[in-house]
């Protein structure tokens, strides 16, 4: 699963990766569209789709935490 990720910082940060991935998986489960899942994960979760998924999952107030975690995964 981790081999094909776009995020260089996945190894050693699997718990963080799991938290961020969960948003995309939940978003996919709501919309049932593989383009949503791919778009959410695009660019190591730095896509506009990820932000839209946070909004759809009613987790916008957690955006600062997710922004920090995505920064860790992109390190």
From Swiss-Prot:
A Pfam family hit: Crust_neurohorm
GO biological process annotation, one example: circadian rhythm
Gene Ontology terms: cellular component: extracellular region
Disulfide partners: 7-44, 24-40, 27-53
Positions bearing Alanine amide: 75
Location within or outside the cell: Secreted
SUPFAM superfamilies referenced in this protein's UniProt entry, alphabetically: Crustacean CHH/MIH/GIH neurohormone
InterPro entries: Crust_neurhormone_CS, Crust_neurohorm, Crust_neurohorm_sf, Hyperglycemic, Hyperglycemic2
Sample GO molecular function, one term: neuropeptide hormone activity
Segments forming a coiled coil: none
The entry's keywords: Amidation, Disulfide bond, Hormone, Neuropeptide, Secreted
Primary location group: secreted
Source superkingdom: Eukaryota
Primary role: Inhibits Y-organs where molting hormone (ecdysteroid) is secreted. A molting cycle is initiated when MIH secretion diminishes or stops.
Family: Belongs to the arthropod CHH/MIH/GIH/VIH hormone family.
The protein, known as: Molt-inhibiting hormone
Species for this entry: Procambarus clarkii (Red swamp crayfish)
Higher taxonomy: Eukaryota, Metazoa, Ecdysozoa, Arthropoda, Crustacea
């Amino acid at each position: 699963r981790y081999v094909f990720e776009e995020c260089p910082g996945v190894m050693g940060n699997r718990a963080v990766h799991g938290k961020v991935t969960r948003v995309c998986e939940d978003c996919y489960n709501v919309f049932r569209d593989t383009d949503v899942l791919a778009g959410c994960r695009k660019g190591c979760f730095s896509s506009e789709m990820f932000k839209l998924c946070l909004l759809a999952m009613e987790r916008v107030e957690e955006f600062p935490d997710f922004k920090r975690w995505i920064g860790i995964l992109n390190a």
